[in-house]
Amino acid sequence: FGGAQALSYAAEHITSGDEQLALLVGVDTQVCHGMLRCGAIGLITGIGNVLPQPVLKLFELCLMALNGDAQAKSYANQLDDALMVLSTFDEGPELVLYYKYLLFLRGESEYEFHFNAFDELSPSQKSFAENHLKLFERWWDGWEGKNHQTN
């Protein structure tokens, strides 16, 4: 399922009450909504391939919030917000190009080239992605929520 509306619909009409069904978040921008409001038990994210530690922390914070940790819920929402621009790349047709470029920027040189040489982000798109990756990395480095532990 796609965005918030689709997740909410799936939770209300399909997965709730059936122990044989599980809801997963498949859109990066909907992690908190899917887990905290729809009962999703897992996530499949593009940005998680680029920034695994922050996305795993987001998942952990959501689980803690579901167990009543109000601070974890606040931190989950902060992290979700900080990841938002990078996460929106998941919603468009160029998601693979964006995430491969971000992986390249993080030192994974094997992601520099694509199957088709003409298939690449524009210079403006590259600059936008790089600026937002740097912004997130600076934010993450100083964010106290990454150290939040369960009681």
Give the label of every model feature segment.
Residues F1-P93:
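Catalytic alpha/beta core domains of metabolic enzymes, predominantly
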Residues S87-N151:
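C-terminal extensions of enzymes
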